[in-house]
Regions:
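N-terminal leader/signal peptides at the extreme start of proteins
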Residues: 1-17
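Short, intrinsically disordered N-terminal pre-domain segments
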Residues: 2-5, 61, 165-168
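Conserved helix-loop functional segments at active or binding sites
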Residues: 3, 28, 52
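Short, conserved catalytic or interaction motifs in soluble domains
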Residues: 12, 31-34, 39, 46, ...
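Alpha-helical hydrophobic helix detector
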Residues: 20-36
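Membrane-proximal N-terminal amphipathic helix
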Residues: 42-72, 78
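Periplasmic/extracellular, small/polar-rich flexible segments of pilin-like filament-forming proteins
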Residues: 65-168
Length: 168
């Protein structure tokens, strides 16, 4: 009988060591996985804002073709529904009139000249990843109708469709 009680004590100690090893392995995996996941989330948010802002290009083209090159561009604000990833402190409107929820933002349209040059600017804010807050995505239209995208996000978050404009 004494042999069985000694065996139980030895097994109990071994189980505790196993649990400590498992916890250590989980900790190491978490230390590697969490930063990778945060990078993935930030990259997906950049892609989302590029798409949401780029979707407004059609409305801008319609306005250019119809000669609506107003400075305020309220007739040409497109059909943006707002985004929880964009800053809502600037032009917090959609179609120039409908207010966007305070936790939402919309791209800002500006006609640079009367020749059809324009910019669509989205500023990250609200629920965007902290490393993106304050960064911008800018779609620029030249007078020939060619659109180019530039951003100031860190190089590791950039997307092929919208390269960073700096060497960060």
């Amino acid at each position: 009988m004494q042999y069985r009680s000694n065996l139980k004590r030895a097994q109990a100690g071994f189980t505790l060591i196993e649990l400590m090893i498992v916890v250590a392995i989980i900790g190491i995996l978490a230390a590697i996985a969490i930063p990778q996941y945060q990078t993935y989330v930030a990259k997906s948010q950049v892609a989302r804002v590029i798409g949401e802002t780029g979707a407004q290009k059609t409305a801008v083209e319609d306005c250019v073709l119809n000669g609506k090159l107003t400075a305020s561009a309220t007739d040409c604000a497109g059909t943006a529904t707002g985004s929880s990833l964009m800053d809502g402190t600037g032009a917090n409107t959609v179609n120039g009139t409908k207010p966007v929820d305070a936790k939402m933002g919309a791209p800002v349209l500006a006609f640079v000249g009367t020749d059809g040059t324009a910019t669509l600017t989205a500023k990250f804010g609200n629920s965007a990843a902290g490393v993106l807050t304050g960064k911008t995505i800018i779609w620029a239209r030249d007078k020939e109708g060619t659109w180019t995208c530039k951003s100031d996000v860190l190089k590791k978050y950039e997307q092929i469709a919208c390269p960073t404009s700096s060497a960060t």
